[in-house]
């Protein structure tokens, strides 16, 4: 019941065991279980990132969150229209984050990484806050209620063009879950607030081993 991630220029013919297919074109959409991130590949060539598992995958939807899962892994995604005030966008992201954890808990899984694609990532509001700020604030509200320690998932945040916010995550049934920090770096949640207005909350990496596998995996931020 393993997971294998690889790049290919052709869509797989057999999709029963595919938990995610990510396409690199300059628009955000989810059609026929293929996710487009708003980023295009070098030379605009057809490139697909395929997440293949060793057992069958089912698909469902919860509160506008698309879910693909099997006995070991769960992939979920949400697309949010980038409209409204700072507080409205922050609340929308906060609600999706809360739903991510509700879905994962109901499936007895732990989120190991969350990816974010935000339009106008460093757009400045009147109070000098940015779209990255609102993401950090929304995430902090959820994490303070969910985590009693600093065992946050890994994360990626990328700025894109367009008017849609994309957030997706990977969760797993974890026999072991351990966060990894880089001793040569200040941990994100310890950034000095007199220098950084944002308070990112993520781990540099997460190592985990699923219940049905003997191999430990490491998933990194960035």
Task: Show which residues each predicted segment covers.
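N-terminal presequence-like segments and the immediate start of the first folded domain
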Residues: 1-115, 122-222
């Amino acid at each position: 019941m393993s997971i294998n991630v690889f790049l290919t220029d052709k869509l797989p013919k057999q999709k029963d065991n595919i938990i995610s297919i990510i396409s690199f074109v300059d628009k955000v959409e989810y059609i026929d279980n293929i996710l487009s991130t708003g980023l295009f590949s070098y030379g605009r060539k057809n490139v697909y990132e395929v997440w293949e598992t060793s057992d069958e995958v089912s698909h469902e939807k919860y509160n506008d969150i698309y879910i693909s899962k099997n006995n070991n892994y769960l992939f979920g995604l949400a697309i949010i229209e980038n409209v409204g005030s700072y507080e409205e966008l922050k609340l929308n992201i906060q609600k999706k984050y809360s739903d991510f954890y509700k879905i994962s808990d109901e499936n007895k899984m732990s989120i190991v990484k969350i990816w974010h694609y935000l339009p106008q990532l460093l757009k400045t509001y009147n109070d000098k806050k940015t779209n990255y700020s609102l993401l950090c604030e929304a995430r902090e509200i959820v994490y303070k209620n969910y985590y009693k320690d600093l065992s946050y998932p890994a994360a990626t945040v990328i700025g894109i063009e367009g008017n849609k916010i994309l957030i997706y995550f990977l969760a797993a049934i974890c026999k072991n879950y351990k966060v990894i920090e880089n001793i040569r770096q200040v941990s994100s949640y310890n950034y000095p607030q007199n220098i950084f207005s944002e308070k990112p909350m993520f781990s540099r990496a997460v190592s985990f081993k699923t219940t049905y596998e003997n191999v430990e995996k490491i998933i990194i931020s960035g």
